[in-house]
Amino acid sequence: MWRKTPGEDLGGILHFYHEIRHEFVRNEDSRKGGIAVKDLYLAGGPYYGVQEVFSRIKGVVETTAGFANSSVPNPRKEDVENGKVQAVECVKVTYNPKKIDIGTLLSVFFTIVNPYTDGIQGKCTGPHYRTGIYYVSGEDTPQITYYMAYYQNRGNSRPVSESCLVFNEYENEKNIRPPIRTEARRLENFYAAPEEEQYFLRKYPGTYSPIDIKLLEETGTLEILT
């Protein structure tokens, strides 16, 4: 069981960075196939693992792997990887809010990533692998703030990865709660990755991913999460 430190204040966990650059971002509320949908942008290591998970979530209409918050238009993947453009590998999650809410999406996100490391997910390291939640609608900030505070309060967690199925239920011996390294900020821009990069794990199932997709399949974890 998770224990709250006496007197611990959930407030002040999340510092939002409010930018004004929106020229590359369309309005979050849109329609796809006649259905009103919303978008949320999630980063958690290599985008192909995150995309594979969220593409299987009921209520998610579409996922697109790409790069978020680049300092230059249409960044090349090699420039993202070497840190030249300050972008992060990210997945655009388009969902039907009548079938799934942002809270469920964030619960899935915090289950499959390690939010306590900075630019490290499994064996993958680099600033482009940092974890992040990027929003385009201010109405999402209360939910994001709540979940950030909640997982900060829960302590040091392990992700579903490295063939180790642990649902963010771990505290170290000293009960130390490291700060969450996940950034939560307004989306500045998003550029889709090349087509060959979309649904990469389905094309190349042997590719290493910090998120153990096979274990998720074998245990039916996605059904549990949704």
Per-range role (PLM):
Residues 2-226:
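Flexible coil/turn and secondary-structure edge motifs
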